[in-house]
Amino acid sequence: MKNYEIAAMSRKELLEKIDELENRLADINFHKAIEPPQNPMVFRNSKRDIARMKTRLRQMELQESSNA
């Protein structure tokens, strides 16, 4: 997921997408323990997407608190 796509998301959309990606990451971890992954970059990219989204959420929180 690209940064401009994340920046365009609302708070609710970000929370839903983070939840979805964390569930997918748990599935990937489970399958990784059983057999080697076909594409190990999926794990890495999922972790990075989650981090980007959490960073964007934090930026939104800080922006709201500074405006209030």
Swiss-Prot record:
Entry's Gene Ontology cellular component terms: ribonucleoprotein complex; ribosome
Protein name (record): Large ribosomal subunit protein uL29
The organism of origin for this protein: Chlorobaculum parvum (strain DSM 263 / NCIMB 8327) (Chlorobium vibrioforme subsp. thiosulfatophilum)
Coiled coil location: none
One GO process term, biological-process aspect: translation
Source taxonomy: Bacteria, Pseudomonadati, Chlorobiota, Chlorobiia, Chlorobiales
Pfam families: Ribosomal_L29
Entry's family note: Belongs to the universal ribosomal protein uL29 family.
GO molecular function, one term: structural constituent of ribosome
Swiss-Prot/TrEMBL keywords: Ribonucleoprotein, Ribosomal protein
HAMAP family registered for this protein in UniProt: Ribosomal_uL29
Top-rank taxon: Bacteria
InterPro entries per the UniProt record, alphabetical: Ribosomal_uL29, Ribosomal_uL29_CS, Ribosomal_uL29_sf
